[in-house]
C-alpha cells in the first residue's frame, strides 16, 4: 500500500509465443514472459494456452504488520481512550516495546491464524489466479540493533507457496520493507525513516534480496513463484534514484541473470515516478528482459483526491490504464483498492487521524472537513449511493488495468475495514463475482 518472487507446470508469459513448452535452458526465449505484444498467456504443460491476465490479491498485514489491517495487535498497548499515545506505530516499535520473546509469541500466533489453507482455497474459488505476499528484509537478516523477530516468517512464506500451488494460484514475493525504510511508511516496518540507501542498511537489504532471489528462482519454486518484487514503493521524490538503480535494482538484475542464471521475473515498483520514466532501464532493447513495472494507484491520500466527484475518479482510473499501454515494459497494477475515503482507523498511521473528517494532522500539516467518518465500517448504514459508487469504482479500475498485464488488489482481508477488504466486498456483492461481471460496463471506453 501507499503504500513491491523455471518452468515446469504452469507459467506466465507476456507475449504471443507459440509452442511454448516449459524449458530449462537459461536464455531470453525461455523466460516466463517478455513484452513485445500486449497479450498475456498461461501456457500449460499440455500445450493448451489460455489467454488470462493477472487477477490477484495482496496478502497485506500478514508477514509485515500494518496497524489498520490488524488493529487488535496494536490496541493491546492502549493506555487511554482519548488518544493513541504509547501505541507502537509499526512492526519495529511493536517488537521493541514487547521485547523479542513476547513479540515472537504474539507474531507467531498472528502468522499462524491470519491466513490459513482455507483462505487460499477460497481465493482460488473466487476466480483469482495470483497472490502477492509482502515480506520484510528482517525475515531473512537483521542489523545488530534491530528489535525485529527474524528467521520465522520464511516457514510461513514457504507454506503459503505450497498452498498456492495446491490450489492453482501463482505467487509474487514482494520485499516490502528495507533496512532503514525506503519510504517512511509504517508498512515498510519503520515509519518516518528514509535511510535504506545508507551503506549498512543497503547491505542488509541486498543480503535479504539476494537470498530471496537465490532460493525462489530455483526450479523447485518456478512453477508457482512467477515474480520477485525487488522493493516495494521506494519513495522516489525523496531518495536518490540513481543510487537506487545502480546500487540495488541493477545489481539484483545482474545477480539473477548472470550469477545464478535464472529467468525468474523481476518486478520493479515505479517509485512514484511518472509513466515512461522506466522505459530506458533494463529494457528489451538492451538485451535485458523479463522486467515488469508495478504501478500502485490510490485516490485517498490527499485532500484533493478525497474531494473529487465520482465521474472524475472514474476518468482518472481509466486514464491510468491508457497511459500504461504505451510504456516500454509490461506493467501490472500491483496495488489499488475500493477506498473512496481514508476513514479506516489508522489507515494513515497510528495517531494521525483521517483527512476526510478533518482529524488528520502531521507535523505542521492539517486537513479540513469533507464529511463524517462515522459508521464507515457499518455497511448497514452505508447509503445505497455509496455502495453503487464503490462498485462502480472497482469495476472501472479492473477494466483499466486489464489494458495491460492485469491487477493485484490491496488487500484480501482485514479485521475491520470494508473499503480495504476484498473478502468482505465480495460478500457484500460490491466486488464483482464472477470477476468479469459488470453492473457498470464500458466505463473506460
UniProtKB/Swiss-Prot annotation:
* Catalytic residues of the enzyme: 233, 335
Give GO terms: molecular function aspect only: glucan exo-1,3-beta-glucosidase activity
Alphabetically ordered keywords of this record: Cell wall biogenesis/degradation, Glycoprotein, Glycosidase, Hydrolase, Secreted, Signal, Sporulation
**Repressor among the record's keywords?**
no
* Cell compartment(s), UniProt: Secreted
Q: Which domain of life is it from?
A: Eukaryota
Biological process per Gene Ontology, one example term: ascospore formation
Note the InterPro entries from the entry. Glyco_hydro_5, Glyco_hydro_5_CS, Glycoside_hydrolase_SF, Glycosyl_hydrolase_5
Q: Which Pfam families match?
A: Cellulase
Q: Give the record's glycosylation annotations as residue positions.
A: 201
Reaction catalyzed:
Successive hydrolysis of beta-D-glucose units from the non-reducing ends of (1->3)-beta-D-glucans, releasing alpha-glucose
Entry EC no(s): 3.2.1.58
The secretion signal range is 1-21
Q: Which PROSITE patterns match?
A: GLYCOSYL_HYDROL_F5 (PS00659)
Q: Which enzyme class?
A: hydrolase
Q: Which GO terms describe its cellular component?
A: ascospore wall; extracellular region; fungal-type cell wall; fungal-type vacuole; prospore membrane
* Its biological purpose: Probably involved in the processes of spore formation and contributes to ascospore thermoresistance by participating in the morphogenesis of ascospore walls. The enzyme may do this by modifying glucan linkages in the developing ascospore wall, thus strengthening it or lending it plasticity.
Would you identify the family this protein belongs to, as annotated? Belongs to the glycosyl hydrolase 5 (cellulase A) family.
Would you tell me the protein name for this molecule?
Sporulation-specific glucan 1,3-beta-glucosidase
> What organism is this sequence from?
Saccharomyces cerevisiae (strain ATCC 204508 / S288c) (Baker's yeast)
- Coding gene? SPR1
Amino acid at each position: 500500500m501507499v503504500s513491491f518472487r523455471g518452468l515446469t507446470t504452469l507459467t506466465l508469459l507476456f507475449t504471443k509465443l507459440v509452442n511454448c513448452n516449459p524449458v530449462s535452458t537459461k536464455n531470453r526465449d525461455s523466460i516466463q514472459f517478455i513484452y513485445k505484444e500486449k497479450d498475456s498467456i498461461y501456457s500449460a504443460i499440455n500445450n493448451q494456452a489460455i489467454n488470462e491476465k493477472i487477477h490477484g490479491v495482496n496478502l497485506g498485514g500478514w508477514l509485515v504488520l500494518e496497524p489498520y489491517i490488524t488493529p487488535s495487535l496494536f490496541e493491546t498497548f492502549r493506555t487511554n481512550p482519548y488518544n493513541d499515545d504509547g501505541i507502537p506505530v509499526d512492526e519495529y516499535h511493536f517488537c521493541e516495546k514487547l521485547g523479542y520473546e513476547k513479540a515472537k509469541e504474539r507474531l507467531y500466533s498472528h502468522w499462524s491464524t491470519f491466513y490459513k489453507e482455507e483462505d487460499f482455497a477460497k481465493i482460488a474459488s473466487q476466480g483469482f489466479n495470483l497472490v502477492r505476499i509482502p515480506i520484510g528484509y528482517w525475515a531473512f537478516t537483521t542489523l545488530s540493533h534491530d528489535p525485529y523477530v527474524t528467521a520465522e516468517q520464511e516457514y510461513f512464506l514457504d507454506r503459503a507457496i505450497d498452498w498456492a500451488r495446491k490450489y492453482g494460484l501463482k505467487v509474487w514475493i514482494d520485499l516490502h520493507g528495507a533496512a532503514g525504510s525506503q519510504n517512511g511508511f509504517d508498512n515498510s516496518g519503520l515509519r518516518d525513516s528514509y535511510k535504506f540507501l545508507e551503506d549498512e542498511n543497503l547491505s542488509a537489504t541486498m543480503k535479504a534480496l539476494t537470498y530471496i532471489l537465490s532460493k525462489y528462482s530455483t526450479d523447485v519454486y518456478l512453477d508457482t513463484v512467477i515474480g520477485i518484487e525487488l522493493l516495494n514503493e521506494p519513495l522516489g521524490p525523496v531518495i536518490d534514484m540513481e543510487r537506487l538503480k545502480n546500487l540495488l535494482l541493477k545489481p539484483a538484475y545482474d545477480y539473477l541473470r548472470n550469477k545464478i542464471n535464472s529467468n525468474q521475473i523481476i518486478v520493479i515498483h515505479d517509485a512514484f515516478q511518472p509513466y515512461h520514466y522506466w522505459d530506458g532501464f533494463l529494457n528489451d532493447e538492451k538485451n535485458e528482459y523479463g522486467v515488469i513495472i508495478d504501478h500502485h494507484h490510490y485516490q485517498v491520500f490527499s485532500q484533493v483526491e478525497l474531494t473529487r466527484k465520482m465521474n472524475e475518479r472514474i476518468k482518472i482510473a481509466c486514464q491510468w490504464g491508457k497511459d500504461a499501454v504505451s510504456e516500454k515494459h509490461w506493467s501490472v497494477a500491483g496495488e489499488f483498492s475500493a477506498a473512496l475515503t481514508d476513514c479506516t482507523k489508522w489507515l494513515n498511521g497510528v495517531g494521525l487521524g483521517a483527512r476526510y473528517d478533518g482529524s488528520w494532522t502531521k507535523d505542521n500539516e492539517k486537513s479540513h472537513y469533507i464529511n463524517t467518518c462515522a459508521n464507515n465500517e457499518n455497511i448497514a448504514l452505508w447509503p445505497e449511493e455509496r455502495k453503487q459508487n464503490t462498485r462502480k469504482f472497482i469495476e472501472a479500475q479492473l477494466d483499466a488495468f486489464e489494458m495491460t498485464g492485469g491487477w493485484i488488489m490491496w488487500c484480501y482481508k482485514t479485521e475491520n475495514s470494508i473499503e480495504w477488504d476484498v473478502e468482505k466486498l465480495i460478500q457484500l456483492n460490491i466486488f464483482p463475482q464472477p470477476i468479469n461481471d459488470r453492473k457498470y460496463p464500458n466505463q473506460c471506453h
